[in-house]
A protein has these predicted regions:
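Phosphate-binding active sites in nucleotide-utilizing proteins
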Residues: 244-308, 312-317
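Cysteine-nucleophile active-site neighborhood
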Residues: 297-377
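Internal gly/pro-rich beta-alpha loop/helix module
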Residues: 89-200
Length: 465
């Protein structure tokens, strides 16, 4: 998936039976994207990259930075245009003509028409394409089908954790593709991208970039930064030291995570333990750190408020100095309460002396960059990490004296920096979803703090004995 979205990769994984990753031209360097892409594709027979917004939409109207087009060129991929042809016939060919000529450096391998009225509609479209763009094949045309629609809500589509792709919907999707798309031609138009060695079996290593022709969300407004060095692997002595256990809440309430962040934690020596608060689970007593990702705690606020063992264990861990890192929904759970749109308040962990309130309108959306201004779980002052924020809630009843901010946040190209990254003791929480691939040292720092906490507990037990 191109862009920072969490939901689409989850749906990809449900359909493909394999993890899906985020490629991002703003949060991550060109080298990082290329390395991730090549690593994943080397283990597969076929890869598909879904675009973000429209093909050429990026952070502004003057360049391709952060766009699907940029990513296709970085990775050496042809593009399949997915065109919503509802209420269009010959005009669809004009649309494809403009997209295929807009950037001579991009190769459009074919077009797939969507939401058609019937077989006659597809024939009109094929005639228009053959008469004006014979070099761009029509790969197929999907008719309108209500059954395959995925429900939407605030923050986007319903997530994979809530199983919107039930078996009947999956079967219908497969049936439509097999019936209405020329899959052989699609594979024929795919390529072996640079730097990828095809697998010995199957058709391995081919890849296409699928891009919608029109945007559906506002583009980000920040300029891309220069490539960020990966920082290399952690020192050998760190990877061989006893592995600290990092508990990760993961279910429908906590479902916004980048798989890269998990891998970076493991590469730094962390041992991840996943648990589901909604299923009544809490993190193990032997945990040395806690990671609370974003998601939809507001939809499960009553359930979470009734999971008193979970909330009390968080309070106890925070009071005992355990490193706890939380993002967005995780921040909400660490507050005193979550207030719903109906005005109901549900008690949460109370680690921070403020609550959060849901809003009917979006509070924030866009790419962000944070600069550490104080030492914290993620590193020392001066470190820059990139991410994004997207939320419909805000902090309320804040007692500023009790909370320090570890970050300086820059959200837009010309906006003033503001404090973020709320810190109390060993707890760090923020509305920002950080991608540690932009600064792997952040993951290593968190693991180091967890390791130090584990050693401190061992010393305490030894003193007692």
């Amino acid at each position: 998936k191109v862009g920072p979205d969490f939901i689409d990769p989850g749906l990809h994984a449900q359909m493909a039976g394999l993890p899906s990753r985020n490629l991002d031209g703003w949060m991550l360097s060109r080298e990082y994207n290329q390395g991730l892409f090549q690593s994943c594709l080397a283990r597969a027979d076929l890869g598909v990259v879904e675009g973000v917004m429209g093909l050429f939409d990026g952070y502004d109207g003057t360049s391709e930075a952060g766009s699907t087009a940029e990513m296709a060129k970085w990775l050496g991929l042809p593009v399949v245009l997915v065109v919503d042809a509802r209420s269009m016939a010959r005009s669809a060919a004009a649309l494809v003509y403009g997209f295929s000529r807009f950037d001579p450096g991009l190769r459009v391998a074919g077009v797939l028409f969507n939401r058609l009225g019937g077989p006659g509609h597809l024939e009109y479209l094929k005639e228009a394409m053959a008469g004006n763009l014979p070099e761009i094949p029509v790969l197929g045309g999907i008719p309108r089908e209500d059954l395959i629609g995925i429900p939407e809500r605030h923050l986007g589509l319903v997530t994979a954790d809530e199983t919107p792709l039930h078996p009947e919907r999956k079967e219908k999707l497969v049936e439509l593709l097999e019936r209405y798309v020329d899959l052989d031609l699609l594979l024929e138009r795919s390529v072996y991208p640079p730097g990828v060695t095809p697998r010995e079996t199957g058709g391995g290593g081919r890849l296409l970039s699928a891009a919608p022709e029109a945007p559906d969300v506002s583009p980000p407004l920040m300029a891309p930064q220069q490539p960020i060095p990966s920082g290399g692997k952690p020192p050998e002595f760190l990877r061989q030291a006893p592995r600290p256990v990092i508990a990760v809440a993961r279910d429908a309430a906590f479902c916004f995570y980048y798989p890269d962040n998990f891998e970076l934690l493991e590469e730094a020596g962390g041992l991840l333990h996943f648990f589901s608060p909604l299923a009544g689970e809490t993190f193990p007593r032997g945990a040395d750190g806690l990671y609370l990702g974003g998601g939809y705690p507001e939809l499960f606020a009553q359930d979470l408020s009734e999971r008193t063992d979970f909330l009390e264990s968080i309070r106890g861990a925070a009071g005992g100095g355990m490193p706890i890192y939380a993002e967005c929904g995780g921040l909400m759970v660490l507050g005193r309460f979550i207030e719903t749109l109906e005005g109901k308040r549900f008690a949460m962990a109370g680690v921070f002396p403020f609550g959060t309130r849901m809003l009917s309108r979006r509070k924030a959306l866009g790419y962000t960059e944070v600069v550490l201004r104080e030492p914290c779980l993620l590193g020392e002052p001066g470190l820059t990490v990139r991410g994004h924020e997207f939320h419909y809630s805000e902090i309320v009843e804040e007692e500023n004296a009790a909370v320090r901010c570890a970050y300086e946040l820059r959200r837009r190209k010309y906006s003033e920096a503001r404090p973020e990254g709320y810190q109390v003791g060993s707890v760090l929480a923020s509305y920002i979803h950080l991608h540690w691939g932009s600064a792997p040292i952040a993951a290593r720092s968190f693991v180091m703090r967890c390791r130090e906490y584990a050693k401190g507990r061992e010393r305490h037990r030894a003193d007692i004995r």
